Amino acid sequence: MFKGKYLGLLVVAAMLVLIAAQCGPPPTPETITVVETVVVEKEVQGETVTVVETVEVEKEVVKEVEVEKVVTVEVEAAAPAKPFEGVEINVLTFTGPQIAEPLQRRGPDFTELTGATVNVIIVPFSDLYQKILTDMATGTNSFDAFVFAPQWMVDYIVPGYLEDLTDRIAADPDIEWEDVAPFFRDFSASYEGRIYTIPLDGDFHMVYYRTDLLEEAGLEPPKTWDDYLEIAATFHGQDLNGDGDPDYGSCISKARAQQSYWWITSIAAPFIQSQGTSQGVFFDPETFEPLVDNEAFARALDIYNETSQYGPPDELNLNVGDTRSLFTAGRCALSLDWGDIGTLAIDPETSVVQDKVGAVITPGSTEVLDWETGELVPCDETTCPYAIDGVNHAPFASFGGWSGGINAAADDKVKDAAYAFFSYMNQPAQSNVDVTIGKTGYNPYRTSQFLNRQAWVEAGMSPQAASNYLGAIENSLASPNMVLDLRVPQNQRYQQVVLDLALSQFAAGEITRDEAIQQIYDGWEEITDELGREDQLNAYLGSLGAN
């Protein structure tokens, strides 16, 4: 959209006709003979008469000549006005530093191109959803645009708070919309066939492992969650980075009011969903009853709790930034995370595990839930039609990838500028670089970002590591049993409030596993009854593509 600076020199060639006397030294006079006609009186036969005669006369003259001279004049053309000169865009996102970093870094470049000033305002993640909702719902409209979790969009779209971006994107060739991977383009960015957000990030959970440790021990990367626990137990307490201190078999962030509540879905998913994406993992698609009071979710809670035995002693207080730092410091054999560790691990300034990190699709299970009995049953061709070597995988498209949305109540010129900024951030020239930098928190979401492995090699990955990292994400995207995030009205209350609280209390030993299950079940049912079961069920089925 904005590809260059408009400044140049206009060269004007002018043909000027100049009088020699005005353009050079005065010419030298010269004497010439001319013929003139004169009238004279003469005596003719004694009479005076007037006659006309022709005579030669010498005169001193100065000749006037015309000369042509080509003069080249250089004129500096005025730069065209920048389209958003004087416009300010207030963009709200979370503290980070990831996610906000590329917005802050590229904002001045966008200002140079367009004249618009980009102000990035940050708040803690736990406050972001409500801050956005309150600002628009109350008509305060302090913020013109937002970078947020696309699963929240339903609560902003239905009341008319978010700008519909469909027509803008259709008229914007620079965004190369068809290059955005179908899942992020057609699901994460869209609602009921209209586009409301611009992806800046692509999110899937993966498991990371130390390739050097597993190779030395003769172990394969984990295929099941039981494998994960066995590998974690094997390496826990060993010195994994050569500094003489014992390290950890598993590092998973579990701090409350952060982003920890998503992990339990990745663990529970392969036990619950086996019949394809439209089956879902959160609610019964016929009754909208929570899918937590069963052996599958109970098993997931047991696994979640056991991973803490092989983690740092303060794991319940760690956020994703903390566990990522531990992994790149060589202190963790395994970790569950989004795509960030893959790029953070190649940073020579912060990582001691360069070219020692592998990534795999999240582990699966050889047992799945019988939805009629609530019990776990073995995988077979019927119960697990998408199993690989007897293992049912259900990769979780958790969070959907940080995305940009625009306040529909903002001034038209500000909305134009905000769209231009998000388009600029999304365009390949910027995004293909940003997704290879660990500190951005942005993971690949364009098809070209998966196909062009050279960009990753140039960023510091070995060809094998790039293939491994991108392959794990591609395997997740291509899975027919992919798990979609919860996208019903007020999903934030179901997950970030009820689920997060119960998990943190369970992990801290404040409540038992069964009490945690009951607390989640009751909390979700209360929200559903308040909002209307039929409406919530229809929204849920619509989000799964099942209605």
Name these PLM-found stretches.
Residues 34, 85-96, 116-121, 144-145, ...:
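Short, well-ordered beta-strand elements
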Residues 78-83, 96-118, 499, 517:
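Short, polar/charged alpha-helical segment
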Residues 79-83, 150-205, 220, 229, ...:
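Hinge/lid segment of periplasmic solute-binding proteins
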Residues 83, 87-105, 125-126, 203, ...:
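Extracytoplasmic "Venus flytrap"
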Residues 105-180, 212-223, 333-334, 349-352, ...:
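Extracytoplasmic "Venus flytrap"/periplasmic binding protein-like
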Residues 187-200, 205, 229-289, 332:
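Extracytoplasmic/periplasmic solute-binding protein
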Residues 232-233, 279-317, 358-367, 377-383:
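Glycine-centered hinge/linker elements that transmit conformational signals in sensory
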Residues 343-352, 365-497, 501, 536-547:
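C-terminal lobe and pocket-closing loops
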